[in-house]
């Protein structure tokens, strides 16, 4: 029997850890549970990840790389259709790593590395939203005073960051279950883009309402 390469074992550990963290919340998942779920000894888990924080940090590194790559696409947003797709894709990535957002304050209070890196995440999100607003302004899709851009971008990032927390508080037992993903992501994208409604050109505003209606009907 061919033994699995250590690299593959390490990746499998991260995959299962992410599933457990997302399902139960990071504070409720021990390394003992992780090793039991994997069917490996605690010592084998320790060989690859000597501490729970190393699991968390490795998962965050994956999330941060994927996020930064996605945020670079903000330069290509020109209208409401682009913005809707961009925001929905962002929420899909956030959903994949939703335990970070469910347990964010607890994680930040215990993990200094995560604390500093999440500050960079917020800055990069804000920078990307500003780039999106700039692109939409140049095409006439939005008409926004430059003095309002900073506050509007910040408000959009706040909703992006805490939307899943809101969903969880509203319905703790079901909100973050996989079968509820589509509806939660649609609501998140809708509420972020609703912050642009006062600034949208009339036809763009109508198109946003059309998109929201179409996706809501499809999610039912």
Predicted segment positions?
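Short, Lys/Arg-enriched anionic-surface-contact patches
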Residues: 2-10
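N-terminal positioning helix adjacent to the helix-turn-helix/winged-helix DNA-binding module
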Residues: 9-16, 152
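Helix-turn-helix
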Residues: 12, 20-58
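Short, basic, alpha-helical segments at the C-terminal edge of helix-turn-helix-like DNA-binding modules
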Residues: 61-67
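Hydrophobic alpha-helical connector segments
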Residues: 72-99, 153
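Amphipathic alpha-helical segments used for helix-helix packing
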Residues: 94-116, 130-134
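Amphipathic alpha-helical packing segments from all-alpha helical-bundle domains
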Residues: 113-139, 150-165, 183-198
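C-terminal peripheral helix-coil segments that are non-catalytic and often amphipathic
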Residues: 165-220
């Amino acid at each position: 029997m061919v033994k699995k390469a250590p690299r593959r074992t390490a990746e499998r550990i991260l995959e299962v850890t992410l599933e457990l963290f997302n399902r139960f919340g990071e504070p409720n998942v021990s390394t003992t549970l992780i090793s039991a779920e994997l069917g490996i000894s605690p010592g084998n888990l320790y060989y690859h990840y000597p501490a729970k924080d190393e699991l968390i940090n490795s998962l965050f590194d994956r999330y941060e790389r994927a996020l930064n790559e996605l945020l670079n696409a903000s330069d290509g947003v020109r209208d409401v259709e682009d913005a809707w797709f961009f925001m929905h894709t962002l929420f899909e990535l956030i959903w994949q790593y939703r335990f970070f957002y469910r347990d964010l304050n607890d994680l930040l209070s215990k993990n200094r590395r995560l604390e500093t890196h999440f500050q960079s995440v917020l800055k990069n999100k804000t920078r990307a939203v500003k780039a999106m607003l700039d692109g939409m302004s140049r095409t006439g899709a939005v008409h926004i005073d430059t003095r309002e851009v900073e506050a509007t971008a910040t408000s959009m990032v706040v909703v992006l960051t805490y939307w899943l927390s809101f969903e969880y508080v509203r319905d703790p037992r079901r909100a973050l279950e996989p079968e509820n993903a589509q509806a939660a992501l649609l609501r998140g994208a809708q509420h972020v883009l609703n912050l642009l409604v006062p600034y949208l050109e009339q036809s763009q505003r109508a198109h946003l309402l059309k998109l929201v209606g179409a996706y809501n009907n499809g999610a039912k």
